[in-house]
């Protein structure tokens, strides 16, 4: 009987509260690495800018950072100054101050033109901006596609703990 209770508790936790999710690829580098195992908080459905979220996309789970919130306008500006690339993310026409991007953005994708987010739409990007399939390529994501937030790394154990 006690095994049944334990199994039931574990199933309920995984279905409703939290579940492990594995990072597939380097799109969130340097924040996260390929094969890191994170805790996805399924109960957290209020999303803020810069939250790291888990998204269901077709048969995959994507781990990305929220850049644009419902109702906002997003645009990525890229200019070349000599051999240097200067990129800016604009939210409602204002430069977004953030330091999550690993390097300057080389491709704006669909965000080369302004994108007006709907009432339940989010614009997400990987921190490794030049090695990420995100909203610039895949389009915006609806709230129902975002399964939860994550801010805790389980494995590898040497990196266990909270991340931003």
Task: Describe each PLM feature range.
Residues 4, 16, 29-164:
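Soluble "head" domains of membrane/secretory-pathway proteins
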Residues 1-7:
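N-terminal Sec-pathway targeting helices
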Residues 11-29:
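Aromatic-capped interface at the extracytoplasmic side
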Residues 9-10, 127:
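Hydrophobic alpha-helical segments, principally membrane-spanning helices and signal/leader peptides
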């Amino acid at each position: 009987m006690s095994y049944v209770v334990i199994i039931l508790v574990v199933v309920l936790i995984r279905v409703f509260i939290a579940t492990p999710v594995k990072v597939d690829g380097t799109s969130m580098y340097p924040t996260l690495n390929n094969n890191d195992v994170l805790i996805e908080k399924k109960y957290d459905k209020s999303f803020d800018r810069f939250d790291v979220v888990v998204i269901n996309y077709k048969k995959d789970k994507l781990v990305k950072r929220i850049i644009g919130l419902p109702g906002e306008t997003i645009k990525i500006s890229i200019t070349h100054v000599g051999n240097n690339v200067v990129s800016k993310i604009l939210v409602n026409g204002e430069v977004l101050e953030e330091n999550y991007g690993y390097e300057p953005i080389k491709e704006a994708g669909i965000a080369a033109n302004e994108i007006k987010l709907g009432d339940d739409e989010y614009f997400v990007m990987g921190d490794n901006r030049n090695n990420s399939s995100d909203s610039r390529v895949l389009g915006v994501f609806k709230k129902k596609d975002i399964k939860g937030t994550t801010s805790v790394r389980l494995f590898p154990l040497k990196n266990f703990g909270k991340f931003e």
